[in-house]
């Protein structure tokens, strides 16, 4: 088995191997759609079909309830009507609307901010085929502009399933749980990252890894957008943390977690759970599975409170508050969590002019205040104060 030794912002691991008995789906296999999977995997299918990934793209003619924006009040940003909407993308944080343009779709000029229930301008131009559709579908054909199905269906993560549907065996379908950690993470990073294919495809530029399917090596199809350490860029903070949503993969490949074989599925279940972000259990419980008090993985204190210096049960005592701060922009002031798992030291963040986890929560305080507070804590850790 091959494991990666490390990564920096903008790089993917180059080693991929398979666990015993696991290989890519047969080359002759074709895509059959998620409904074919439901015949044998009904409980999993029933959970999946309620997830956001299974419903992020909707046709409002079939699902008029999919449109959550308020069209009852006039707004200068809204220069279109519901009848012009051919496709709806999103529902949790934002919702975007697209009109049919020949055999393609084009964005309409306003998007709905779900959190604040207000319209915001949407300046994206160009067709969705090069920007969006490859990740929001199964088996998108760049020549014909056709799909096996819209949304993240079973075969997006398991590969083409015709052989398995005809004669189910463990060896004729990709199971990400049986892949080595790098290949398993590739399945998610293919879409949860900012990057580009290695070259033009059919003379066109795409923003998703054309040709990749589960079980292949993502690095052969996709190059994460690069970052120059110490500089703030459109996509990256100076320390390499992602500044925008959908950069979880760019973050994660920098992490010690990734280097040690932790995968996305160690924390998330893409088939759906009752927990936020489809976590396998509440976030704190996931972290404490490997990082309980006196754990060899740290923290080495006797209690969690001695490590966090916040009251048990408070927001400040949650592992994600310090190790996964909300610093990546989704829309307006709606932020999502970083996935490098680094503690961003306030004094370093101040030098780099970027957010830190302390003042992200304590919005009325300064990095200098945070540094002084960290210095005064019992169980003092110098690395929390300066690098």
Name the predicted role of every residue range.
Residues 5-17:
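Bacterial N-terminal signal peptides
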Residues 18-24:
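Signal peptide processing junction and immediate N-terminal pro/mature segment
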Residues 1-2:
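N-terminal secretory signal peptides that target proteins for export/translocation
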Residues 130-133, 255:
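Short, contiguous clusters of charged residues that form electrostatic/catalytic patches at enzyme active sites
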Residues 106-131:
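A short, surface-exposed interaction/processing loop segment used at functional sites
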Residues 132-137, 142:
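Conserved catalytic alpha/beta cores of large enzymes that bind or transform nucleotide phosphates
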Residues 24, 28, 35, 43-109, ...:
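Primarily the internal scaffold of c-type cytochrome electron-transfer domains
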């Amino acid at each position: 088995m091959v494991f990666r030794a490390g990564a920096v912002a903008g790089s993917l691991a180059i080693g991929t191997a398979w666990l015993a008995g696991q290989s890519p789906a047969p080359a002759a296999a074709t895509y059959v759609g998620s409904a074919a999977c439901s015949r044998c995997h009904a409980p999993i299918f029933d959970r999946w079909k309620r997830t956001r990934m299974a419903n992020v793209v909707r046709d409002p003619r079939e699902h008029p309830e999919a449109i959550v924006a308020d069209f009852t009040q006039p707004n200068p940003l809204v220069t279109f009507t519901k009848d012009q909407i051919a496709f709806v993308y999103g529902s949790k944080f934002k919702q975007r609307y697209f009109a049919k343009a020949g055999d393609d779709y084009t964005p309409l000029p306003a998007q709905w901010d779900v959190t604040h229930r207000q319209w915001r301008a949407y300046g994206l131009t160009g067709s969705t085929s090069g920007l969006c559709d490859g990740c929001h579908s199964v088996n998108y054909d760049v020549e014909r502009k056709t799909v096996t199905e819209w949304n993240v269906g079973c075969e997006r993560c398991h590969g083409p399933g015709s052989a398995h549907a005809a004669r189910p065996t463990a060896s004729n379908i990709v199971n990400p749980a049986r892949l080595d950690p790098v290949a398993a993470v590739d399945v998610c990073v293919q879409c949860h990252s900012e990057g580009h294919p290695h070259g033009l495809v059919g003379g066109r530029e795409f923003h998703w890894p054309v040709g990749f399917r589960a079980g292949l090596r993502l690095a052969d199809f996709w190059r994460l957008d690069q970052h120059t350490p110490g500089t703030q860029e459109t996509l990256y903070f100076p320390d390499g943390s992602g500044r925008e949503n959908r950069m979880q993969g760019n973050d994660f490949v920098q992490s010690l977690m990734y280097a040690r074989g932790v995968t996305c599925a160690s924390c998330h279940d893409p088939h759906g759970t009752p927990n936020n972000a489809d976590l396998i259990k509440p976030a704190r419980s996931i972290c404490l599975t490997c990082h309980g008090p006196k754990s060899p993985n740290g923290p080495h204190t006797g209690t969690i409170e001695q490590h966090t210096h916040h009251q048990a049960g408070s927001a400040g005592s949650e592992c994600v508050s310090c190790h996964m701060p909300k610093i990546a922009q989704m829309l307006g002031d709606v932020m999502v969590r970083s996935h490098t798992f680094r503690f961003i030291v306030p004094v370093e963040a101040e030098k780099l002019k970027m957010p830190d986890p302390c003042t992200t929560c304590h919005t009325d305080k300064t990095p200098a205040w945070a540094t002084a507070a960290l210095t005064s804590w019992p169980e003092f850790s110098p690395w929390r104060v300066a690098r």
